[in-house]
């Protein structure tokens, strides 16, 4: 159930039924899980960037390991070899690359399950230096020329060097 956390007691509406599972829409959280936290990001409910921002750090790492184990199991591989998740102790500003999408005259993250870019804002996942890059490109995106931008990839290395790649799509109509 999207928006719920394991251990939540919820009221939900079933919206589809497949052979091996149901899909439901969250109506109300009646009792919160012990794993649930208040997301620090103001855009958490809008943005598809930080899907695990509403659970505590220990549980986040447990889910990540379970995801890998599940993928190994489905592929018929030995999942016993999957170790604990390697992670940074920092939950903020740890990303060294992001992809932003162009929509509505600016770059941003896609809203969850859509192709609509939402305000990049002050994303807590990436370094603060990325904000200046995104702000600059958004202010000058009309200067790119005759091709419409589609995506922007920002990456940095341990020395702090930043690489920006802007991908273009269709030709802008004249």
Walk through the language-model features, giving the residues of each.
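Accessory RNA-recognition modules of RNA-modification enzymes
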Residues: 1-174
